[in-house]
Amino acid sequence: RGAVAHLLKLLLKTHPADMAWVFRHLSFAERKKVFNVIAQTDMVGDFLSEIDQAILLEIVQDLTPKYLVAVISEMASDDVADLLEALPEEMANEIRQLMVKEDREEVDELMQYHPETAGGLMSPDFMALDGELSAGDAIKIVQERSEESEMSFYLYITHGDGQLAGVISLRELLLHPPYRQLKNIMNSNVTSVTTDTNQDEVAHVISQYNILAVPVVDSNYNLVGIVTVDDIIDVIREEATEDFLRMAGAGKDSEILLKSTMDNALTRAPWLFASWVGGVMAMFIITFFHDELQKVLALAAFIPIVIGMGGNIATQSSTIIIRGIATGRVNMQELSKVIFKEMRVGLILGTVYGLFLGLLAFFGYAETQYLGLVVGFSVLFVMTMAATVGTFVPLILKRLNFDAAIATGPFVTTSIDILGVLAYFLIAKSLLNL
């Protein structure tokens, strides 16, 4: 009794982002009940823009287009565009038809851009002023229009034809005399992006220059929108998550709880198949050296650690390089420098761990002469080779315009399995005269 009223009071004190986080951990039936309470507040639009797409599709099944139009009328146009992109096409079109013409045209303008470009991320709600205005007049306009713009930290100065001319921060505006014209106090060296700039590059620009928003211009350099830092934070998090998931062969969707078991299995299968192929080929190599293995059975005991050390250092190297490529800290002009540096790292670590394992083999299997030497050299060679392969593969894939995050993992693990086992037995055959 009174539970709904208490829940309503609690929701009114809760940020929509926190509501969305809790919402995703509820059952389907619980979500329906809680949303019915959320629907009694004016936070529905903010809440819908925060929740996961899979949950959004669950919720809208029970909502009418007329109700959704009322909700999105209070939302920012870029959030509306994102919402409509997530909905089934038929439902999205029905909602668009019911929208006010001016709002519909604004949203349609945003939806024409790819969602992973500056055009797809931008908000058309920005503060643009004519350069002929005085600082005093500009302050009055900002006060009158502050609720209309996405962010008032920056004021963008345009020519009469709408072309971007400069930028000035709100702080700088307040510090200048009210009679000074904007064109005389603005910063004309504006960092901007175009509507088709990839979201990765937009994120790089904002983080590189430590700005809160970046203006978006069209092919004629007309100011059409801004991308704000809050949107870019989401992009950076999503891109980093996607890269790490793809490196592990787990697809690019981190919402494993919202996907079916079969979907998760199918997503991971190709990467695991590549590892399986590498394991099978390594098995055939071991079988090929069956006679040598029978003569020195102790060789079998060290196969896992030799291959494991190679696989681990290859993963480290490839992860460092892939992340470096993504952040722009590693480029193709330094290809040989990067490869030789990681090769030296592999050589140092291979020497250290090869020495340790060689001593272990020497004292643990004293009856087999030179086994310690075989194991030590194998670890040294395999770790050096693995560090080189782990560095070389993502750089070459990048040069060939392949997605290094996706292709590196399977290729590297398969290569190390095959080359590591082969090198181990060839070294053993040579040093032990098998």
Regions found by a protein language model. Give the residues of each.
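Hydrophobic packing positions in regular secondary-structure scaffolds
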Residues: 1-251
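Alpha-helical transmembrane segments in multi-pass membrane proteins
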Residues: 16, 271-279, 283, 302, ...
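Juxtamembrane "helix exit" motif at the C-terminal ends of alpha-helical transmembrane segments
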Residues: 36, 276-293, 356-367
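Non-transmembrane, extramembrane segments of multi-pass ion/lipid transporters
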Residues: 105, 231-264, 317-339, 395-401
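Short helical (or helix-break) motifs at transmembrane helix termini and adjacent helical loops
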Residues: 243, 307-323, 413-421
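Soluble-to-membrane junctions at the N-terminal ends of transmembrane alpha-helices
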Residues: 255-274, 332-351, 375-376
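Membrane-water interface of transmembrane alpha-helices in multipass transporters/channels
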Residues: 288-303, 365-377
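Interfacial loop-to-transmembrane junctions
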Residues: 396-416
